[in-house]
Amino acid sequence: MSSVDYIHLDDQSIATGGTSLTGTAILEDRMDHILSLSCQDLTIEEVQRYQNKLWIIGNITNLYRLDPNIIHELLSNNFFVKIEFDYNFCPYRGEIPHQKLANQICKCPHDIILNPLISSTYDLIIKNAKHSFFMSERQRAIYSIHMPLMRFDKTSVLSSCFTKNTFDLLKTHALNYKNNQYAILEGYGGWHSQAKGVTEAKNFCVTNNIPYQILPNQSYDHHIETLSKFKGLVFMPIIDDTCPRCVIEAKLLNLDVLTNINSQHTTEGWWNKSLEQIEIYLKNRPKHFWKIVDENCHTNAS
């Protein structure tokens, strides 16, 4: 590895899934200068050792399991940016799951009774983050409601991001022969499948006489190849899904995309442009991230 300039902190330093794929794409161009750490293994020694590096902090649910002193040290004395993939300020990961799973209106992160550590953590993030990045405009708007002290001039919207290899993979399969069916992703069972609206997607297809097939979970490359052979994708999440990759992948594969307002990026201007313009926009998002980092996020070592 080359010299370490950045510390990437996330719930899992190496993982699969949309969050990990987007995180990898954002960091791809400088991966040789990034050390990845997982929240659950973070120590006070590591926080202090890399005090002069820029920390790139992603999902932090596992951070709440640590000694609060470690969190305070990290967010008070280190340089960091925060990437908000979903709704880490809530233990249920958002307003809708909070309502459905706890039967309560979400007042996070400042519901002290529910989880004071989340509240104090986000107070420090809002106060000390050099910049915060969001997946969609509507996600950022929800954060601003829950954290009214958040400064918009220190925030940006990225969207989901894709590696160069993923763009190549999507382009390879975009011209595949399409059958006459619509795909519904099966999810990972339990609450995940419920949140992703599997039942709602099935009901939508039945109501509208749309032939569909449930797509089982596969390795990423096989998933893209299989998905590419469908006429379209039906995705009806019941939660605020900040910028679901699956609908972007489907669009870049030339599929008809049927989704709802809970796919939060679909109200943004870039989503309704041509495939070529969408691809250009998406390819520039990691560059946008690093441009902001380079211009605004200096450390003592810079």
Task: Describe the predicted segments one by one.
Residues F85, V234-I239, N260-N262:
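Short Ser/Thr-rich beta->loop micro-motif in glycosyltransferases that lines
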Residues S159-H223:
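Conserved catalytic-core segment of nucleotide-activated headgroup transferases in glycan assembly
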Residues L114-N115, S119, K127-H173:
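Donor nucleotide-sugar binding/catalytic pocket of nucleotide-sugar-dependent glycosyltransferases
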Residues L54-N59, L74-I113:
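Active-site proximal beta-strand in glycosyltransferases
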